[in-house]
C-alpha cells in the first residue's frame, strides 16, 4: 500500500531566548529565510523596515500571515547566529559576518 500524500518535511524553529520553537514546513521556512537574508545582504534594517519589506516582497507569493512567519523565522535566524541585532537606537538587524 503506497501513501497518496507525502509527508511534508518540517523544521522546529529555535528562539534566541530559549523559548519553545514552532513547527514550520521546510518550504515556508526556506521562503522566509531566503527573503530575510536577501533583504539584509547589503544593509541593516530596523524591525519595522524588515517586516515592511518582507510583506511587500512576499505579498501574492504567500497566503499566510507574513508578519507571524517573518517574526518566527527572524527569531530562528537570530538563535542560529545567522543574523544579529545591532546596539544602535533603534536596533537594526544585519547578517552576521
State what each model feature region is.
Residues 40, 58-62, 81:
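Short amphipathic alpha-helical interaction patches enriched in hydrophobic/aromatic residues
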Residues 44-61:
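Short acidic, hydrophobic short linear motifs in intrinsically disordered regions
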Residues 62-79:
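Short amphipathic alpha-helical interaction segments
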Residues 88-97:
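Short, cationic-aromatic polyanion-contact patches
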